Amino acid sequence: MITKEAAQKIAKLARLKFEEDTVEKFFTQLSTIMDMIDILNEIDCKDIEPLTSVCNMNARMREDAVTSSDLSSELFDNVSGNSTQLAKEVKYFITPKVVE
């Protein structure tokens, strides 16, 4: 069981601000969550294998094939404006300054 003072400290640490009428609701909800966690902690699961996925399916594997993937010329064909040629040469997108 969690105390009301501990709930208020947790809210302060999380930088949560509550109106006076909602503090009691927060306290009740947090206490319920902590009680659920206590119930889960009581479960003996040392003989249970951890799940890697909720779906018990095998992934279809394929062989890796090396291919040419330099698509920069096609990518930079979409650049418009005065910086088209420079963008193709340096292989960067040139954008207006956004941070001063």
UniProtKB/Swiss-Prot annotation:
One of its GO terms (molecular function) is ATP binding. Keywords: ATP-binding, Ligase, Nucleotide-binding, Protein biosynthesis. It catalyses: L-glutamyl-tRNA(Gln) + L-glutamine + ATP + H2O = L-glutaminyl-tRNA(Gln) + L-glutamate + ADP + phosphate + H(+); L-aspartyl-tRNA(Asn) + L-glutamine + ATP + H2O = L-asparaginyl-tRNA(Asn) + L-glutamate + ADP + phosphate + 2 H(+). Its EC number is 6.3.5.-. InterPro entries: Asp/Glu-ADT_sf_sub_c, GatC. One of its GO terms (biological process) is glutaminyl-tRNAGln biosynthesis via transamidation. It comes from the Bacteria. Belongs to the GatC family. HAMAP family: GatC. Allows the formation of correctly charged Asn-tRNA(Asn) or Gln-tRNA(Gln) through the transamidation of misacylated Asp-tRNA(Asn) or Glu-tRNA(Gln) in organisms which lack either or both of asparaginyl-tRNA or glutaminyl-tRNA synthetases. The reaction takes place in the presence of glutamine and ATP through an activated phospho-Asp-tRNA(Asn) or phospho-Glu-tRNA(Gln). Heterotrimer of A, B and C subunits. This is Aspartyl/glutamyl-tRNA(Asn/Gln) amidotransferase subunit C.
